[in-house]
Every structure is written in structure tokens, then in C-alpha cells.
């Protein structure tokens, strides 16, 4: 039996090829230097019938207790994995979204868009750059990761520069309660943002008729302008 990466049969460097190997197909192609070799901790013979022929077990011996049927075997990588190549930001043929390439700065979680691992929005940006643990577009202002005022499902900038958490309602993406382009406290009815009951640019008690906020009777009028809370 010919063992991939071993000329002239199966030598000690190959780790031997047993019946469990099942032969090596033409797609094996040998083991490159980027594999780092395989030691005694390998669950399977070196370079035996694994996708890309890199010496990385599908399941590590410590976590799986050996490569048995419970590990799911050494299956090929599907299209959802984006394939397995030397430039992949994923462990070889393990289809795990953890970056290991230079662009990701070592083994760190990635801000992923679609199925491709990309660096975070900005250098030094932490886990806040990502929404939950799922790969979604970053909620960022300019190049820095900050909380966003989101409308619907799309991340948009806050109403105004320097606007604080008051610009957003809770942690849910809803339109901001704002006057003009600046985030100011609103005269809101219930929890819904309605036109502010205001005189000029300041929120004051209103003279309301029915459920509609109308301007006070006269300019500069105080609380006597309103009847109770209605």
C-alpha cells in the first residue's frame, strides 16, 4: 500500500498505514511544510487520506479521546466552509470559524462578513465589534467600534456626533427620538416616539387637546397653560 507523502511504501516517518487508512487517493498530494508535521499525538496515520493532506486530526485526541466514529470521521469540507487552503483563516479542513492567519492577528475570534474571515473594523477593536458570537456586519461609526443607533436591521450612525446612549431606545434598534439632527430628550407619549410637545427648542408642559400635542396658548406661558395632565 502506498502512503501519501511517503515514497517507497510506509516508513516510520509516516506513522505506518494500517487497514484503517483505507488507502490514499490521488487527491492527497502529500504533506506540505505548512502542516508542521504530525507527532505521536495524531489520531490517525500521518498524511493518510485527509483532505488537503495536512496533518490535523478532525478531532484532537484530548478532546475526543481518539478518532472514533463519534468524531464524525475526517470528512471533506463543504462549500459552507469556504474550502480549505493554506490561506484559510480556519484550521485545515476542520471548518471551525477561528482565525489563525496573519491578517487576523493570531488565533482570535473574527468579525466575519458572509463566510470570509476579515479583520475587525478597526485595529484594537474588541469583542464589541461583533454582534453576539455570530458573523454579522459590524456596528461601527467611522473606523471605531461603537454602539450604534440602528434603524430596522441596518446599522446607521447616531443622530449626531457625540450623541450618547439616550439617542437609542433600550438595546433594540429603533429610530431615535431626536429633534433636528441633534439628540435631545423628547416629549414622548407612552413608549412611542411622537412629535415633541415643545416650545421653541425646549421641552415644556403642553396644552394638549385630545391626544394631539399643540403649542401652548401663548409664548412663555408656564404650567398654568395646561389643565391637569390632559
Swiss-Prot record:
The Swiss-Prot or TrEMBL record describes its family as follows: Belongs to the KRTAP type 5 family.
Q: Does the keyword Lyase apply?
A: no
Q: What is this protein called?
A: Keratin-associated protein 5-1
Q: Where are sequence repeat segments found? A: 42-45, 48-51, 54-57, 88-91, 94-97, 116-119, 134-137, 144-147, 154-157, 172-175, 182-185, 192-195, 202-205, 212-215
Does this UniProt record's set of keywords contain Repeat? yes
Q: Where is this region: 14 X 4 AA repeats of C-C-X-P?
A: 42-215
Give the organism the record lists. Mus musculus
Q: Which UniProt keywords apply?
A: Keratin, Repeat
Q: Which organs or tissues contain this protein?
A: Expressed during the active phases of the hair cycle in the medulla and the inner root sheath of the forming hair. Also expressed in the upper layers of the epidermis of skin.
Question: What does this chain do?
Answer: In the hair cortex, hair keratin intermediate filaments are embedded in an interfilamentous matrix, consisting of hair keratin-associated protein (KRTAP), which are essential for the formation of a rigid and resistant hair shaft through their extensive disulfide bond cross-linking with abundant cysteine residues of hair keratins. The matrix proteins include the high-sulfur and high-glycine-tyrosine keratins.
What is a single cellular component term in the Gene Ontology annotation?
intermediate filament
Amino acid at each position: 500500500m502506498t502512503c501519501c507523502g511517503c515514497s517507497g511504501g510506509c516508513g516510520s516517518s509516516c506513522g505506518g498505514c494500517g487497514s484503517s487508512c483505507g488507502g490514499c487517493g490521488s487527491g492527497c498530494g502529500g504533506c506540505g511544510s505548512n502542516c508542521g508535521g504530525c507527532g505521536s499525538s495524531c489520531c490517525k496515520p500521518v498524511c493518510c487520506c485527509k483532505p488537503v493532506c495536512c496533518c490535523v486530526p478532525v478531532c484532537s485526541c484530548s478532546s475526543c479521546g481518539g478518532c472514533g466514529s463519534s468524531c464524525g470521521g475526517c470528512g471533506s469540507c463543504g462549500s459552507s466552509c469556504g474550502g480549505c487552503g493554506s490561506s484559510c483563516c480556519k484550521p485545515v479542513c476542520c471548518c471551525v470559524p477561528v482565525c489563525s492567519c496573519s491578517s487576523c492577528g493570531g488565533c482570535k475570534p473574527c468579525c466575519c462578513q458572509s463566510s470570509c474571515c476579515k479583520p475587525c473594523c478597526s485595529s484594537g477593536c474588541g469583542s464589541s465589534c461583533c454582534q453576539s458570537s455570530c458573523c454579522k456586519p459590524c456596528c461601527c461609526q467611522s473606523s471605531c467600534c461603537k454602539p450604534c443607533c440602528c434603524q430596522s436591521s441596518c446599522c446607521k450612525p447616531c443622530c449626531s456626533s457625540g450623541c450618547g446612549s439616550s439617542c437609542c431606545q433600550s438595546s433594540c434598534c429603533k429610530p431615535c427620538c431626536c429633534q433636528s439632527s441633534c439628540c435631545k430628550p423628547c416629549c414622548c407619549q407612552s413608549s412611542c416616539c411622537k412629535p415633541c410637545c415643545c416650545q421653541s427648542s425646549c421641552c415644556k408642559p403642553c396644552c394638549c387637546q385630545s391626544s394631539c400635542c399643540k403649542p401652548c396658548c401663548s409664548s412663555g406661558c408656564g404650567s398654568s397653560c395646561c389643565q391637569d395632565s390632559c
